[in-house]
Amino acid sequence: MASLDVSSLLGMLSGDGVSALGKSADAKKSQVSSVLDSALPLLLTGMKNNASTKAGASSLNKALKDHAKDDTSDIGSFLQNVDLSDGGKILTHILGDSKEREAASIAERSGISSDQVMTILSAVAPLLLSKLGSSKAEDEEEDDDGAGLGDLLGSLLSGSE
């Protein structure tokens, strides 16, 4: 399994990534970090829940394939140029009706507005799909043992507990 967990995702976003997110959301780095600490496990859990049904897994697999080839070599640049509208749609697929409630909860804990949280999450969602998609593609190339999407998401979440 390719080495990817919540800690490594947070690490990738440190520095330029947090700065880019802070600029786009008009938030301090500490606030962005607080949002990410809460949001990444939430997004991964949402994806895992979606992947628990055949239709959800199929939809998520398609999204991962669509985003796997995104160029994320410069995360700061990726986040500055990300399509926030696409990110918002991704969030709706991942979180469904709870999107606004979750954003409000994260906003309260992070000391920023729900709109700022939504901007950050809308930027991070395509990056998350890209990283998961490329990790899944690597796993399929390395070892075609039938490990599913739920296994990948579960391994990511186990690193956050």
What are the residue ranges of the model-derived segments?
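A structural "flexibility-hinge" signal
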Residues: 1-161
